[in-house]
Structure formats: structure tokens, C-alpha cells
């Protein structure tokens, strides 16, 4: 049985759920790495792109105090203890395909979408705050997912996946499969969950919505139909959940690579009004960000120029950063209501970039350091 300690405790400590802080500064100042630090993490399973191939590294760091860390899966059939000291990077690898899972712990096997599972989600408890990343290791489709801690727990989320893509590949293409997916883990019994796609998009069940009930520790993965993206999809629940979403091996519109862009998503309550997007190395239009409005009458500007006026709740769009690649050039995104901003970019300066995706934190100051 999964340990309930932090699952119950965080509900009685609302201050923990307001610790997003000024986490954008991690892009600039290593001393501010505490922005993603926490003592509890719930990590929904990462959907595989090739059967049995999701080798996952979990990496831990601590900024100030030595931390005793416990990693376990939903039923504690996987359990490991680590000690993380300040200044050290501690890595544990999940490499073995587990009987009954057909994948490593922390991953979801290709054939088990739209089904409840009880062993593939991961949980982390720490005696002192730590920073956690999941690293998908393979010669292709590598990715890094930042654990959001208690800031990643809530009941109302919007998610995204790359939008400027050539196609979603459901058949075998050089031994991989491309999918837009959303992955969820419940923290309490009898949690009712609804995933609702934006108008015009459907899931692989042929419907624009998926509804199910999960017990504590159970997880669920839903995928979109061919060429339908996640941008603007809403996830709501009756009790707190954690959500990871994005795309596996999606072919970008200017080349052949099939790339992964996945992130753990923060709930609506942790969003803000101001974001900074830093230009990557991709050529136009492949360096872009996506936005989602969470309230009616939302206005959004980029460097003072309007990109959305009086947008309705759930309105979403894609904005390509103009001009030639200028790595590091900042673009200021401001809104009058809280919004999501997801960036898609690359470190490759050519027309066939390897594109990742991540949710950008807002830079509004909340008065906290975590």
C-alpha cells in the first residue's frame, strides 16, 4: 500500500501550494534552484514511444541541507532510499522491464492507454527540500521532465503538446510511435477525473472527452487521435491529482525527426500574468510558444503587441518568435488574467531541429522562495 503521509499532509498545509515563486530565474541564476525544490513529488507515468525502451534516470540535488529521500511506486513494490547532500548530483536509474508492467517503473507500456494501472507512477518523499528531474534515456527521443513537487498537485489543469508538426505517427516509423498524451495519477480514493479536448479534437476513443475514477496511486494515460494536438485540453478532478502531458516522437513541420516534448504541468491556481520567453536556435517558425487562457476576457501581448484580445476561458494559440534565430533574446509575454505558456525550441541551428517542450513559470513575485 502506498504511504499516505504527504498525500494527506499537503492538504492541511495550503501554504505549500503557493510556492511557485519566481522560478523563471532558474534560467539565469543557479543560486535560485530552490524554485523547484520540495519534499514531496508525485510523478505520473511517462508513456512509451517504443515498447520496453523507457530507461529513466531520476536525478536529485539539494541546495542547503542533507536530505534523506525515499522513492517508491504506487504499491511500494519498488522502494529505494537515497541520501542527497548539498552540491552533489545523485542519480538512480530505472532500467529493468518489470513483469506485469512490460516497462520500467515510472513508464507506461504502449498498449495500455485508456486503462487504470497501479504500479507505474512514482512518488518521492524527502526530509529536506530537493530538486528532482526525470531523464528519458535513449539514443533517440531523449527528454527531461522537471518534477513540480506540491506545486504540481491540484484539481484544474490545461495541457499542451507541440502544434507545428507534420504528422502524428501511429504506425511504426523506424520502430517508433508518435503520440500526444496526457498522464494522470490520483492521490486519494474515488477521484473523479474528466479530460476534455478543445473543440474539433478527439481522443483515440473517438470522443472529445474521457471520464474515469481512480483510487489512490492509480494512474491513467489517454492519447489523442492522429494529428489532433493537446493544446487547450482541460483536465479537472474531484480530488487532487498530478498531471504530465506532451508529445512523443512528433515529426516537426520542417524535417524528419520525431521529437519528445513532455512536462509535468502546474494547476491553474499557480499561474501568473507575466512570462519571459527566451529565443532558441531554431529557424522561423519552429521556435514558438503556445498560450492558454484560463479566464474569460483575457488579453495577451508579446513585447506590447496584442496576440489575443478578449479571449474566452480555454482560448489557446501558437506564436512563432519572429526573425532569424537569436539565442537568448527575451520576449515578454503579459496578460490581464492568469495564463499557461509552453515553449517549443531547440539547440540545433538548422531546418530540422530536435524540439523539446516545457511549461514556462511566470515571473510574478509571490513573496516566497519555494
Regions found by a protein language model. Name each.
Residues 1-38:
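Bacterial Sec-dependent N-terminal signal peptides
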Residues 36-370:
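Intrinsically disordered, low-complexity linker/terminal regions across diverse proteins
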Amino acid at each position: 500500500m502506498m504511504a499516505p503521509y504527504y498525500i494527506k499532509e499537503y492538504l492541511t498545509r495550503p501554504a505549500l501550494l503557493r510556492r511557485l515563486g519566481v522560478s523563471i530565474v532558474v534560467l539565469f541564476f543557479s543560486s535560485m534552484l530552490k524554485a523547484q525544490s520540495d519534499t514531496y513529488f508525485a510523478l505520473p507515468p511517462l508513456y512509451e514511444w517504443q515498447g520496453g525502451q523507457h530507461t529513466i534516470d531520476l536525478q536529485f540535488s539539494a541546495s542547503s541541507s542533507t536530505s534523506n529521500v525515499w522513492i517508491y511506486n504506487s504499491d511500494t513494490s519498488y522502494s529505494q532510499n537515497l541520501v542527497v547532500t548539498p552540491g552533489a548530483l545523485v542519480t538512480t536509474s530505472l532500467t529493468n522491464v518489470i513483469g506485469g508492467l512490460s516497462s520500467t517503473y515510472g513508464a507506461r507500456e504502449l498498449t495500455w492507454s485508456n486503462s487504470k494501472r497501479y504500479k507505474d507512477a512514482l512518488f518521492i518523499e524527502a526530509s529536506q527540500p530537493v530538486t528532482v528531474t526525470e531523464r528519458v534515456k535513449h539514443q533517440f527521443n531523449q527528454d527531461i521532465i522537471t518534477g513540480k513537487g506540491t506545486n504540481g498537485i491540484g484539481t484544474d489543469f490545461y495541457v499542451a503538446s507541440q502544434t507545428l508538426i507534420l504528422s502524428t505517427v501511429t504506425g511504426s516509423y523506424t520502430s517508433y510511435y508518435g503520440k500526444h498524451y496526457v498522464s494522470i495519477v490520483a492521490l486519494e480514493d474515488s477521484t473523479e477525473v474528466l479530460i476534455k479536448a478543445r473543440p474539433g479534437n478527439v481522443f483515440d476513443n473517438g470522443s472529445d472527452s474521457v471520464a474515469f475514477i481512480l483510487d489512490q496511486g492509480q494512474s491513467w494515460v489517454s492519447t489523442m487521435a492522429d494529428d489532433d494536438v493537446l493544446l487547450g485540453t482541460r483536465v479537472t478532478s474531484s480530488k487532487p491529482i498530478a498531471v504530465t502531458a506532451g508529445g512523443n516522437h512528433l515529426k516537426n513541420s520542417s524535417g524528419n525527426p520525431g521529437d519528445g516534448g513532455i512536462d509535468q504541468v502546474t494547476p491553474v491556481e499557480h499561474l501568473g500574468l507575466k512570462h519571459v520567453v527566451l529565443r532558441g536556435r531554431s529557424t522561423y517558425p519552429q521556435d514558438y510558444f503556445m498560450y492558454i487562457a484560463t479566464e474569460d476576457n483575457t488579453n495577451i501581448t508579446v513585447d506590447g503587441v496584442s496576440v489575443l484580445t478578449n479571449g474566452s476561458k480555454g482560448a489557446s494559440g501558437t506564436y512563432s518568435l519572429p526573425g532569424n534565430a537569436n539565442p537568448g533574446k527575451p520576449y515578454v509575454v503579459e496578460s490581464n488574467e492568469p495564463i499557461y505558456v509552453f515553449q517549443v525550441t531547440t539547440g540545433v541551428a538548422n531546418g530540422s531541429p530536435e524540439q523539446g517542450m516545457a511549461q514556462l513559470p511566470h515571473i510574478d513575485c509571490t513573496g516566497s522562495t519555494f
